Amino acid sequence: MGQGVLRGEGHPNNNPNSKVGWKSLVGIITIFMLILCDQSDGKICYSMDIRNNISQFSMLEDCTVIEGHLQILLMFTSKPENFRGLRFPKLTTITDYLLLFRVYGLESLKDLFPNLTVIRGTRLFFNYALVIFEMVHXKEIGLYNLMNITRGSVRIEKNNELCYLSTIDWSIILDSVEDNYIELNRDNKEECGDVCPGTVKGKSKCKHTLVNGALVERCWTQDHCQKVCPSDCKGSGCLPDGQCCHPECLGSCRKPNDPSECTACRHFQNEGVCVTACPKGSYQFQGWRCIDFNTCQELNSRCQNSRDNSCPPYVIHKGECMPDCPSGYIANSTTRTCTPCAGPCPKVCTIFQNVKTIDSVTSAQELRGCTVINGSLIINLRGGNNIATELEANLGLIEEISGYLKIRRSYALVSLSFFRKLRLIRGEVLEAGNYSFYALDNPSLRQLWDWHKHNLTIIHGKLFFHHNPRLCLSQIHQMEEVTGTKGRQDKNDIATKTNGDQASCEDNLLTFNFIKTSHDMVLLRWDAYWPPDYRDLLGFMVHYKEAPFQNVTEFDGQDACGSNSWTVVDMDAPERSADGKTQSPGCLLRSLKPWTQYAVFVKTLVSGSDEGRTYGAKSKIIYIRTNETIPSVPLDPFSVSNSTSQIILKWKPPSEPNGNVTHYLVYWQEQPEDSDLYEVDYCNKGLKLPSRTWTPPTEIDENGNENQTEHTSVNKCCPCPKTEFQIQKEQDESAFRKTFENYLHNEVFIPRPVRKRRDLFGVANGTLPDPVTAPPLFNVSSTRAPDEPEPKIYSQKVWFKESVLISGLKHFTGYRIEIHACNHELSMGCSVAAYVNARTMPEATADKVVGPITYEYVEPNIIHLKWQEPKDPNGLIVLYEVHYSRVGGIEEVITCVSQKQYNTDKGGKLRVLTPGNYSVKIRATSLAGNGSWTEQAYFQVPDHPHSNIVKIITGPIIAVFLLLIVLVYCVVQKKKDAEGPAGPLYTSSNPEYLSASEVYIPDEWEVPRDKINLLRELGQGSFGMVYEGIAKDIIKGEPEVRVAVKTVNESASLRERIEFLNEASVMKAFNCHHVVRLLGVVSKGQPTLVIMELMAHGDLKSYLRSLRPDAENNPGRLAPTLKEIIQMAAEISDGMAYLNAKKFVHRDLAARNCMVADDYAVKIGDFGMTRDIYETDYYRKGGKGLLPVRWMSPESLKDGVFTAFSDVWSFGVVLWEITSLAEQPYQGLSNEQVLKFVMDGGSLDHPENCPPRLHSLMQMCWQYNPKMRPTFLEIIDMLKDDLRPSFQDVSFYYSDENKPPETDDLEIDFENMESTPLDPSSCSLRDQSSRTNIYEEHIPYTHMNGGRKNGRILSLPRSSPS
């Protein structure tokens, strides 16, 4: 079982000054072993401090819960390979906090703690539950199963390699993110190319969430998404399929809705089951689990047997096993339960080591509420504000002291009346073996108690009063009478000369004969002194204080209020041997500051002699300086690069020089680039290119303010001066950072002795390294190839200044720099390092491809280009761009060659179809950006050597084959003509004599005319009027249903009638709730009717405009809310996703072509309803077909390319229409201006009052690169958590049809899914003309156009307005 270092709160080992015997330590360990073994599975471990050696990780073996904190820190020699194979998958919960600090080589926690789910934060580290600080090699956090930080915040700071921070949504893990502090990491420098799972392949796998107005994909690493559960789960966690865990779970579970399968519990865990409260017979323990009564009692028994007074006496109270009873309750020693007090609650306070010194208000507060002191009290108050009131508030309830009460050198005390309830001093333990009340050297003490009102009994022991010059003897004699101690005292116990007098005599001079110093201690010895009656010598008082200048007097800093700037150490009088020889008395002054001058003097403390004289003695004030020691770390290191080979480094002196800082040691080492970048194909347009930045040159003034140098601000405005509020805020943040760092260093650095000695000067040293005689503890990350030598470490000494110019560096190279402060005592070593990362500036020509570009004709139509890689690029080359075009031609082609492909081919391969002479130029892209283009080179693509022979042989064969196809076609066509016309083809030389029935064959969709009754006109469509009607028996189970009936005008031509029915034929293929459904066709007789699903609220554009406040036809509804807009967007996306799955491309998605049903559901509209109504929304480009340019994507406007991605662009415009209540897109621009604006990369502005979430979705749809736009299914995935439950029942997204394809025939190629309608003219020779011409002349816009389906092309109607 893993067991941590026992350093929890309240543990005696936390106090470096505590002295706990080995028996006590064994008892303490036994108690915590009981806690560990209490669980049947043996998986609970206590707080752990893993430091210095990686072998200490073995303590974590088999731990499931750490009941306490986990600190991993200070490993300077570990390397990445040391952590490979270290894995603790059982650890799921930490009850306090997780701290990581300066662990070299640790790059990620994904393998170390793959299942850590909950950090409870019961006790925090400076208000933080997760601290990651100065992890020099960490690249990612990687806690991909972390779902809940119950209490506290997150602090991630000064991790120069740490990425994947902007891809984490902390609001999912924490209740509040306002107090998080995430600064000074690589992520903040925009250097991270964070790639979430699936991004490389263009198929995002991770969910998107909205933070600060940005909709971002969420992941922990390139292999692990951040787990985002549905909002219904409310923090309980969920399974991968989205099923919520039981409400009592916290973070995760193994089965849904099962409290026994939780990873962690929201409230309490009882025998493996999560419960709201512990059941009867069990008790809450440590805030998260239940234990039985016997276990709690056993904890208390073990604690008592340990003989450790600080061990808490566990009791049962209100269903909880706790260390002590709360205020207002007292523990029953038999049952170990808490019972309410009758009146003021007696509270027995047991004093650690039997003596408690009250030397400050803070120490007095520790006894607040105590009524019985089981031990002795020493009052030693040198000063303070409002001290009497504070003492009465904290000590005023004490009624009984079992030992003695000693008032010593309390300059601030005038009276002891603050002990207002003190009634009994038992004297079970006596001071100096005799005294139960001891008052010594209290110059302001004038009154003990008001003896007329106060009663005090002293059972054992005597009184002792000396050197209380303002305390009258009458007060002392009266105390003898009241307390019952009269007659117990000897004549020397109460000094008649030094109590109540205002004088003190020190006639003799004491001389120091031995002085020895260390960095924090001084040992003093002085000549022995005895008064004539050696019994009058009570002891010595050694006074000392810091003295920067040698002008101190004894009475500096003392006043009538008791303030005293001197620190006083009391020393007992030495024992007097029989022969009268006495060892020189001495004193060891501890806890001094290094390299600090102190003023010191010593004086005797004597009683008055029988003759009335006081035989005192005092030394002169001497000045002693403590020794130097290792300085503290240099402050605020700052680095800039002013050229391609230099870095300017500045810092501030250490806050504690601990000597005269003479010089600094500066070490620097080149940091290799991340070799993983070679493995990623950055030619994939879905990936962001990695980058590295350098800090532009700046100047730092004397106050530490940064000013940009002149050459960086050319042609730029000067920065505005900071306001007082900004300056104050920066100062507060800086002060808080320093406070946190001081707290961190104080907590994690545990002093340890360098050597052991038997004398008083066993000086303790910290965990700092030995004297620096070797290079520092640099550690190279695993980004370096195994066979690559480790970069050399360089060093330089910097004398008497805090800056250095490091020269001779490589261009655009990262360096890790360490700065050590050294003082004149080099044998002690130099300080812990302050480190900073810097990068030199890029070389302008380093990324240029030099040398000739050669080519090789490897196979037909493939050219292998070869070129030399830049010898010394700026960082790494990530890709090459090859720009080539046919000489004299117009079309230019740019192709991308990844570094990985270049390493394989030593160049790139081009597929060139057309023979001819070509020009080519190449440029490289490095971590610093794009290099420059090479000079143009030329290559020739020849005709295939055997092309003429092939043509001679294959020509006749092809001609014969085509002739056979024509003959077969004619035979089949003749047979069809004999059977009668069918399908969309017609060949009549005079089509006006044909009726619709001759080109349309009735099928199962045919509806008898007498089942349709027309009620009223709805509006004019493309072919004729549209009516509302009643249809009988056309929907199973519904005798009558309201429908929309489309008609064709009587004056319509035969072609228009054919197109009218063809549109109906196309819609027969659709069966989706969010696409308007065809219900039937009446083709027999005139007029021809098409029966459609009735959309009661008309088209979406008209409906939105009716919701405007000033609209005359406003139905009384308000503008749609955010939730309603999201519902509309999902319904439109669902209909479009269905059409994409059917391999149809819409090409004209707009609000006018969406319909609103009676229940306000939005559906993709039917055909022919809106072309004439909204003809102004279309534009006739070059006299050709009508184009909806304001809804078209850039690639559609440029090249006539229509794909599912171009429909997504149009969907973004529809969203804009919904939020603006159907305003015209690009209002104020003409159609020609819109064409140019969009093709140049423009898009619509932010709509007024548009929520950030919707605008982020619009921007995703308007990505210029089509591949960067989301699919309609991905859009629904982003919105699904906010949709109505009914959406799951009716949508295509949740239907069985929306499943991954099982065969290649069903795969959708979104990039090539172009809309290419066929009509008689499309089979002409004009197919060989440019795609743009075909688009302009032969593809008019319809509301729904077919694409490829099952290997054939559906002919589509031409519904251009005449």
From Swiss-Prot:
Residues 1012-1287 form the Protein kinase domain. Keywords: ATP-binding, Cell membrane, Cleavage on pair of basic residues, Developmental protein, Disulfide bond, Glycoprotein, Kinase, Membrane, Nucleotide-binding, Phosphoprotein, Receptor, Repeat, Signal, Transferase, Transmembrane, Transmembrane helix, Tyrosine-protein kinase. The active site is at D1148 (proton donor/acceptor). Disulfide bonds join C45-C63, C163-C192, C196-C219, C206-C225, C229-C238, C233-C244, C245-C253, C249-C262, C265-C274, C278-C290, C296-C321, C303-C311, C325-C338, C341-C345, C349-C370, C472-C505, C683-C896, C822-C830. The modification Phosphotyrosine is found at Y993, Y1174, Y1178, Y1179, Y1335, Y1341. It is a single-pass type I membrane protein. GO terms for molecular function: ATP binding; insulin binding; insulin receptor activity; insulin receptor substrate binding; phosphatidylinositol 3-kinase binding; protein tyrosine kinase activity; PTB domain binding; SH2 domain binding. It comes from the Eukaryota. Its EC number is 2.7.10.1. Localized mainly to the envelope in oocytes. Localized to the animal hemisphere during early embryonic cleavage. Expressed during organogenesis in regions of ecto- and mesodermic origins. Expressed in the entire encephalon, the otic and optic vesicles, the gills, the somites and the pronephric tubules of the embryo. Also found in adult liver, muscle and regenerated forelimbs. ATP binds at S1022, K1046, E1093, L1094, M1095, A1096, H1097, G1098, D1099, R1152, N1153, D1166. Residues 694-714 are annotated as: Disordered. CDD domains: FN3, FU, PTKc_InsR. Residues 973-1362 are cytoplasmic. Residues 38-184 are annotated as: Leucine-rich region. Belongs to the protein kinase superfamily. Tyr protein kinase family. Insulin receptor subfamily. This is Insulin receptor. It comes from Xenopus laevis (African clawed frog).
